[in-house]
Regions:
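Acidic helix N-cap motif at the loop->helix transition within catalytic regions
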Residues: 1-5
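Cell-envelope/extracellular polymer assembly enzymes that use nucleotide-activated donors
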Residues: 131
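Acceptor/aglycone-binding surface of glycosyltransferases and processive sugar-polymer synthases
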Residues: 8, 12-31, 36, 48-126, ...
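Cys/His-dense Zn2+-coordinating finger/ribbon modules
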Residues: 42
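C-terminal, non-catalytic tails of nucleotide-sugar-dependent glycosyltransferases
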Residues: 171-186
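Glycine/small-residue-rich loop that forms an oxyanion/phosphate-binding "nest" at active or ligand-binding sites
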Residues: 45
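Catalytic donor-sugar/metal-binding loop of nucleotide-sugar-dependent glycosyltransferases
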Residues: 99-100, 121-124, 134-151
Length: 186
């Protein structure tokens, strides 16, 4: 459907995970000399009509614009498990970056050229959104949240199902604690 709409579509040889897929997109953007890159999930939930608002933030000197589900009240209601995970990650990331972030797990993001260059080198491979925020913070990049209202899921299912929810929580929490330890060692 994306190709039919005129989008360039990258076919990877096999399922390498979300982090590798996103990093491949950043590598493509770097090689083509793009000034901005926009990340959207493939399930149709992210309103592409909001992309200009994210890009506008980048035009104003921000390195990352996050399409946020929580910065303002919306109709979006995550499951109880997902809501708990988001709250835990948000609390931990806020400890590290020193400012309130409402949606640390949003996959709807726009990145500046500076962020593209960083993320081609340093991008987590499993469930990368939270870790990528910390990486950007460590590299003194500025980010902002733009309120968005999600569409209902049009296709597919979440990559974080019942089977791997515990793995996801442990892996990301461990990565955040490592980031906290590294920060204190500086």
């Amino acid at each position: 459907q994306a190709r039919e709409s005129g989008a360039m579509v990258m076919n990877l040889p096999y399922n390498m995970g979300i982090g590798s897929a996103v990093q491949s997109g950043f590598l493509f953007a770097k090689e083509k000399g793009y000034h901005f890159a926009v990340q959207v999930d493939g399930d149709g939930q992210h309103p592409t009509s909001e992309i200009p608002r994210l890009l506008s933030a980048l035009d104003n000197g921000v390195d990352l614009a996050i399409g946020s589900r929580f910065v303002q009240p919306t109709e979006y209601r995550p499951t109880l498990t997902r809501s708990l995970g988001i709250k835990i990650f948000t609390f931990l990331v806020c400890l590290i970056v020193g400012k309130k972030i409402y949606d640390t797990t949003s996959g709807f993001r726009a990145a500046s050229r500076k962020a593209i260059l960083l993320l081609t080198e340093k991008y987590p491979h499993d469930y990368p959104e939270v870790e990528a925020l910390i990486t950007r913070h460590r590299n003194e990049m500025h980010f902002v949240e733009i309120p968005v209202e999600l569409n209902s899921r049009q296709a597919g299912r979440s990559s974080i199902g019942a089977k791997n929810a515990v793995y996801y929580m442990l892996k990301v929490t461990l990565a955040v604690f490592i980031a906290i330890i590294k920060r204190r060692q500086r």
